[in-house]
Amino acid sequence: MQSFTKEVVLAAASGHYNEIATRFLPMLSLAVSRPGRHVPDPFRAGSKDGFRVFKDFNIKGKMIFNQAFGETNKVMDVWELMDTLGISKNFNDALEQVGSFLGCERTGFHIKGTSYQPIDKKRQEEALAAAKQAAAKVEAEAKKAEEERYSKGEAAIQKQLAMTIPLTVKDPRCKPVFDYFENRGLGMLKYAPESLFKDLRYSPRTPYFENGKVTGYYDALVSIVHSNNKVWSLHRIFLLNGQKAPVSSAKKVMTPKFDGKDTSRFIRLGDVPEHGIIGIAEGIETALSCFCGTRLPVWSAISATFLEEFTPPKNVKAVIIFADKDKSEVGQKSAEILRKRLLEKGIKAWVCLPKSEIPQGSHGIDWNDELKQKGVFGFPDPIKLFEFITDKLQKK
């Protein structure tokens, strides 16, 4: 009996990996129904977001595990996972199984030890229809669970907001946050305009949850995360005695009120000025450091991923991207992705990196490090920077 060739089966599989996964790897069904989004790792108990299939999974069949098989950020494809789990004996065996499932034409030589029979067109269509039906059921269940999750997220956000007070240096109750700023080299924020803190709040005695249980109560800097001109979530930094709290995750983003995957998510730190120039950075402390160094409003994208997706308001004409300098170059690459996106939208954009070298033994350096080491002299001269950008805008 002839076998399936690699070229024939791979060509047939492209565009059908959703059905293939549903048939041979049903544990991936939730992830397959939500391509590109983090879901619990199907092989690691307690994981909440340790796995995802890539957005083009149906075409390429690739996925990524945060932790799997002794590796970090392990990228695998359907074929490797079938082999790892023992669903197939080897790659050729997987080709036989998938080729039969897809009803591929046998054009190669017989492979010793395999005995799968090709299925006819009718059986192929029935199998694919059944797989699609199963995937649709999983997707419907996932959507329902997601709606419930967002509903709970909204309730928790409202409860947290009710515990907060507006952040202002005039209110002595906010001292724990300004003590934290002082320890991060941001003491000059005591003299910043009130508009800078419009979306920042202070929360006393904030419960900290670990694995669903309250393990302590801390002061917290609470920041409103916006998406599509709406409150999407809250970002919290838990504090103790002017430092980050001694917990496993001192920074946490609460379960959001809605999806927000197709929109930009960020923390506003100041209003857009009339000249339309703002900055964007990853972390809150980094963004506030850039404000101290340049006097421009610099917003926080929270993470490198959100930085790539940042879309400024319509009245923004130019954006300075204050990137982190990482050994892995994640920060630099994300900043460059954003710069190109903004240019395509007709928005002037530049990437600005710290000049200091990454210290030995460190993973990277950011603009807060630069501020602590060099003060405002570690930043581009504000007047020259403004003149440079306005000149570029006039030549548009």
Predicted regions and their residues:
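N-terminal structured subdomain of primase-like DNA metabolism proteins
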Residues: M1-K121, K190, F388-K396
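Short, basic/aromatic recognition patches
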Residues: G187-G216
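Phosphate-handling DNA/RNA-contact segment within nucleic-acid enzymes
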Residues: T206-K314
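Amphipathic alpha-helical segments that form well-ordered structural scaffolds
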Residues: I20, P176-G187, S233, S289
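Conserved active-site segments centered on acidic
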Residues: L95-T168
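TOPRIM fold recognition
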Residues: M1-H16, N73-M76, H275-G276, I284-K396
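A short, highly charged nucleic-acid-interacting micro-segment common to nuclease
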Residues: L10, I157-F178, F209-G216
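Terminal peptide-recognition signature
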Residues: D41, Q67-A68, M82, F181, ...
